[in-house]
Amino acid sequence: MKRWVSLDSGESEDPLPEDTCPDLLDGDSNAKPPPAKPHIFSTAKSRSRLFGKGDSEETSPMDCSYEEGELAPCPAITVSSVIIVQRSGDGPTCARQLSQDSVAAAGAEKPLKLYDRRRIFEAVAQNNCQELESLLCFLQRSKKRLTDSEFKDPETGKTCLLKAMLNLHSGQNDTIPLLLEIARQTDSLKEFVNASYTDSYYKGQTALHIAIERRNMALVTLLVENGADVQAAANGDFFKKTKGRPGFYFGELPLSLAACTNQLAIVKFLLQNSWQPADISARDSVGNTVLHALVEVADNTPDNTKFVTSMYNEILILGAKLHPTLKLEELINKKGLTPLALAAGSGKIGVLAYILQREILEPECRHLSRKFTEWAYGPVHSSLYDLSCIDTCERNSVLEVIAYSSSETPNRHDMLLVEPLNRLLQDKWDRVVKRIFYFNFFVYCLYMIIFTTAAYYRPVDGLPPYKLRNLPGDYFRVTGEILSVAGGVYFFFRGIQYFLQRRPSMKALFVDSYSEMLFFVQALFMLATVVLYFSHCKEYVATMVFSLALGWINMLYYTRGFQQMGIYAVMIEKMILRDLCRFMFVYLVFLFGFSTAVVTLIEDGKNSSTSAESTSHRWRGFGCRSSDSSYNSLYSTCLELFKFTIGMGDLEFTENYDFKAVFIILLLAYVILTYILLLNMLIALMGETVNKIAQESKSIWKLQRAITILDTEKGFLKCMRKAFRSGKLLQVGYTPDGKDDCRWCFRVDEVNWTTWNTNVGIINEDPGNCEGVKRTLSFSLRSGRVSGRNWKNFALVPLLRDASTRDRHPXPPEDVHLRPFVGSLKPGDAELFKDSVAAAEK
């Protein structure tokens, strides 16, 4: 029998007890293996069905048990090599193969253990290294590897390494380094360490993903040292962003997983390790980088926003130091969105505000800033905001994404109040769009006057089309009709263009696009009028008057140009969509129900003479109906019941019934439910709606005006867009490769009573209008001071170049030491730069 040799003393130890091996190793063919743990899911189909419903099991889904099966009896195998397991202190175990001489000195050979998936999985799950002592010998003797299919879970493709990673004890599992050493000696280390799940639910997840998810830096280091692929993508259903299904989207890659789980140390290790550094610009299956993934996991809560913005800032700075020329924030996903545009489109207002107002103080990373403080005086400071990816001159700009996003996007109205978006839209409105909008309003008013006049003086004799008489009035009328039809054609094609470009959903059609829809319906009625007119049908008048009525209603669209009227129009819209629609649904149900009951009760001919005489005497003076009115129809009964709703009904409008008590009870119940209950409830709901949306009405109006501004700009020619573009091209510093960093910037003057000018980045000593006065700049990359409203005509680049020249030949007459300025972030957001500010103050 084989004996085991101690590495320290070389003395023999007692042999392992006989019961350490299964009975079948002793040749007992009748012995049965112990029962395996039951499956969580009997089949892959049942498992996917259960997860689709969101059910759970006591056992972790990724740690499901292996299949239950019996071991086939095999003869005992003897080998001449021995595996020695040595534990060095508290560190990981290691394994080595003894030489033949050592084996000979150990004594007689011992029968070798047989291993299958069940035995290996049990050993690694229980952290039992002794059970795996003969595993290497078994694999070498049988010429097998741990990556063979017989050692993997047939349903999920899970290996023993993945099983061990899922069964850590106090953050470690001693079988992991042993398994890696065995894989190395069987020439399958790379394949073994990068083995991943193969089922559709956890497809692509490797041991490195699990180690990062378990927040275990030691295991991450061990796996990377042994060749783990840092670009492995976990793209199973569990790792996709699917509405209504459990899962966690983190960007598929290990780097994104570490970032989205707030593990900065692992992020730095993955990017800076000497074995296989991760690619910071790598994308997942939807084209998202690590920055996109951070935006995706943001949920607008304070704690989450703080960690996401902090991690975003750290990765951005680290990427700039590792790859100075890489523009990580400008990389787009498959939808063509940058991280900034993605934050705007998904309503992540905290992340959006951070990116727009980011001001980095480190000189080597200052080119990552999107905000540059120009000067400060007390609580007042002037800032230059970078307009790249913001203005409409670029595709998928932030303004377009917010304005044209779905109505279900959270914080859609509030995002337009974040600087510089708020001031930028106001500048666009004041400079150009306002005048164009008022001109369009005037033209539309003139169009409606012409349309109304032509409709009012339409011919009434004969059938259309009418002959043109040689009279001045007919010429004016025909001219008005032609202009009215031309306006309808214009609104029709404009509506077609709008629907093709925006492709709004049914909900967005009534919430955000109601004005465009009304203009389109107005055009449809006008075109129907033309068709009926030339078809010799007098019914053209019906469609014409509908188009005329909608035309005047659409005048409310132009209230967007006036704040008070615009907010009032928003309230009307919300009350119609929220309260009136629900009221009309319930009211129509009551009206139809009681009308069918009353019309069933009424019998024509019953007491006809008395009824006709009484009703004729009662109603003829009001001109409401003739003496021979019949109420044995649903239409006439509905009209009578509608009069009860507005308080003009008569309980004795007919006597053609047999059961007077039943008739009166029906009418009284209808009056109570509609005139008393529903109408008063509608009034109360409208009052509540006004109070509720009073605060957000201004934001909604600003959103509507922003849409109008962008629609107006789209009608400009390309040369006009450049001429009317807000902001100015300025040099704000130098790029990492030494070139001029020129950006299109927009100036915003802000007042902040909580952050004073004790911390200054780029600042002029003389704020305001000080032309001709010598300026002392306080930073090596200084910008010139822009004064007042004429800041666009001020040349900033010469001052920067002059400042840079002086910095290259240092002999300053005096040193001005000013501490860096944090910016205009909110108090909660300003804490994100707390560490960098403290370091700068030191």
Swiss-Prot record:
Q: Where are the ANK repeats?
A: 113-141, 156-188, 206-231, 252-279, 288-324, 338-361, 396-418
**Residues carrying Phosphothreonine:** 147, 373, 708
Phosphoserine modification sites are: 505, 778, 804, 824
A Gene Ontology molecular function term for this protein is: ATP binding
Q: What is the effect of changing residue 650 to E/N/M?
A: Attenuates calcium permeability
Cytoplasmic compartment: which residues? Answer: 1-435, 501-513, 560-562, 687-842
Q: Which UniProt keywords apply?
A: ANK repeat, ATP-binding, Calcium, Calcium channel, Calcium transport, Calmodulin-binding, Cell membrane, Cell projection, Glycoprotein, Ion channel, Ion transport, Membrane, Metal-binding, Nucleotide-binding, Phosphoprotein, Postsynaptic cell membrane, Repeat, Sodium, Synapse, Transmembrane, Transmembrane helix, Transport
Name the record gives this protein: Transient receptor potential cation channel subfamily V member 1
Which residues of this UniProt protein bind Na(+) 1?
647
Q: Where is this motif: Selectivity filter?
A: 647-650
**Residues the record lists as binding Na(+) 2:** 647
**Main location, first listed in the record:** membrane
